[in-house]
């Protein structure tokens, strides 16, 4: 049987005699474990076998963090960590790390808490099914990329050092500690979302 999934609802508070809407009010309702503190018992019974399997995976501890890692511009521990992971993951494609790792701040949806790191916490930080993409770019294109990052007041990066003014102007940049050469080819490890031209 078919059904509906409501992703957005509004309540018509005011109508005319002909039922024409003249006023609408709305508010955000976060659908999470706090909102659903008292789930339907029958539904919970049906879902339990699947929930148990998912929980077993999500609660698996895969590492530890000695500190809270937050996200934010111009850079942060978490954004730099994720960019560094992408840079190192390029070994699978290149046989060596990429010259640069890049992730957008908007793609990071949570912080990494101090203590044990679970699979579920990684999914909360990176909830989208993004794939690793390794791009090869000329130095001239890299400079345009760096200017774009500067105009956003920073993104998650690794393998490079940038100096950005408070106004979002690129002041200086190096790749692997070296100046950017216009005709040289560089590799950038990022996510498919950005590689496809999305993001700000």
Where are these regions (language model features)?
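Sec-dependent N-terminal signal peptides
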Residues: 1-2
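C-terminal motif of bacterial Sec signal peptides marking the signal peptidase cleavage site
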Residues: 5-8
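Feature captures C-terminal
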Residues: 12-32, 80-91, 95-200
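Start-of-domain marker
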Residues: 18-52
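Electropositive phosphate-/nucleotide-binding environments in soluble metabolic enzymes
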Residues: 37-40, 44, 76, 80-84, ...
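Short amphipathic
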Residues: 59-65, 134-136
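Second-shell loop/turn segments in exported
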Residues: 66-76, 130-133
């Amino acid at each position: 049987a078919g059904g509906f999934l409501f992703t957005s609802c509004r309540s018509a508070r005011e109508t005319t005699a002909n039922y024409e809407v003249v006023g609408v009010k709305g508010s955000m309702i976060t659908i999470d474990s706090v909102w659903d503190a008292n789930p339907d018992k029958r539904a919970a019974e049906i879902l339990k076998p699947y929930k148990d399997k998912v929980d077993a995976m999500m609660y698996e501890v895969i590492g530890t963090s000695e500190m809270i890692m937050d996200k934010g511009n111009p850079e942060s521990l978490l954004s730099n960590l994720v960019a560094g992971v992408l840079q190192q993951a390029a070994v699978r494609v290149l046989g060596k790390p990429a010259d640069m790792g890049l992730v957008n701040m908007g793609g990071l949806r949570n912080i990494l808490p101090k203590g044990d790191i679970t699979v579920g916490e990684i999914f909360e930080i990176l909830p989208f099914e993004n794939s690793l993409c390794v791009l090869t770019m000329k130095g001239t294109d890299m400079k345009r990329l760096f200017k774009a990052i500067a105009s956003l007041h920073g993104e998650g990066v690794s393998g490079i050092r940038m100096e950005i003014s408070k106004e979002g102007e690129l002041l200086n940049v190096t790749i692997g500690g070296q100046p950017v050469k216009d005709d040289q080819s560089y590799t950038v490890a990022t996510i498919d979302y950005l590689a496809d031209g999305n993001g700000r």
